[in-house]
Amino acid sequence: MDSRMSDLQALRGFLGGSERLFVLTGAGCSTASGIPDYRDGQGQWKRKPPIDFQAFMGGQPARARYWARSMVGWRHFGQARPNAAHHALARLAQRGQVDLLVTQNVDRLHQAAGGREVLDLHGRLDEVRCMQCDWRGPRGPWQHTLELANPQWAALQAGAAPDGNADLEGQDFSRFVVPSCPRCGGIVKPDVVFFGETVPRERVQRAYAALEHADAVLVVGSSLMLYSGYRFVQAAARAGLPIAAINLGRTRADDMLALKVSRPCDEVLAEVVP
């Protein structure tokens, strides 16, 4: 038996032996849906790190750059559809094997695939919120507002980048118009957790509560370089839970894994979860 078949057989056994699986997914779970990931096989950034919270809140130029890239990128990101990995994980959940699926992604593709008990750890890009009055709204109308205010930008075409942005390096963002909150005139931000921003406590508590009842952990498409997800794997290892990962390249928790499959998530899960 070659190593590929051996890995798949081992993963089938791992999943078959679990009744209360804690699943953690990252950007690699959505690459087959056309959404790029952040890191290379060594866990290093493929491009500049995403904008951080302080920069976004601290100046109009940073917000203009962010919203210009997001507005152009949304046309691609908003049309992304679940791939075989999302559908396979949804099937596991529908069979009652998944206690909670925690995703670091903001694309809502697990829900689109019919997933149950999904926790959006880092929020969701299909909603926006005001940082002053907490007004919230869907991305569709906000996207329309952005495009009306910036018709010359709306015509641009660019390659997709992670988290719904577009590659617009070299552009002059100084004339991009960033609309204000329709209620109070405050700063509007996507309802996602930026770098430098804290994950809401209730989400972290819900994840830890599910982990306490889990009998195994499956990591899908994450290098675990971000502490926000890595901490749950750390806690699982301390509790003696078996941990498996499907990921191309190294993860921060390689020494904690009982099993690792270094192949594309969609291919692997389509084969082991019929």
Curated annotation (Swiss-Prot):
Highest rank taxon of the organism: Bacteria
Reaction catalysed by this enzyme: N(6)-acetyl-L-lysyl-[protein] + NAD(+) + H2O = 2''-O-acetyl-ADP-D-ribose + nicotinamide + L-lysyl-[protein]
A GO MF term: NAD+ binding
Residues noted as binding NAD(+) in the record, renumbered to the chain: 26-46, 104-107, 221-223, 247-249, 265
Localization terms from the record: Cytoplasm
Annotated SUPFAM superfamilies: DHS-like NAD/FAD-binding domain
UniProt keyword annotations, A-Z: Cytoplasm, Metal-binding, NAD, Transferase, Zinc
Cofactor: Zn(2+)
EC number: 2.3.1.286
Signal peptide location: none
Cofactor binding remark: Binds 1 zinc ion per subunit.
Active-site residues (renumbered): H122
GO terms for cellular component: cytoplasm
Listed InterPro entries: DHS-like_NAD/FAD-binding_dom (IPR029035), NAD-dep_sirtuin_deacylases (IPR050134), Sirtuin (IPR003000), Sirtuin_cat_small_dom_sf (IPR026591), Sirtuin_class_II (IPR026587), Ssirtuin_cat_dom (IPR026590)
Location, primary (coarse class): cytoplasm
NCBIfam families membership: PRK05333.1 (NF003738)
HAMAP family, sorted: Sirtuin_ClassII
Assigned protein family: Belongs to the sirtuin family. Class II subfamily.
Function per UniProt: NAD-dependent protein deacetylase which modulates the activities of several enzymes which are inactive in their acetylated form.
Name this polypeptide is given: NAD-dependent protein deacetylase
Organism: Bordetella pertussis (strain Tohama I / ATCC BAA-589 / NCTC 13251)
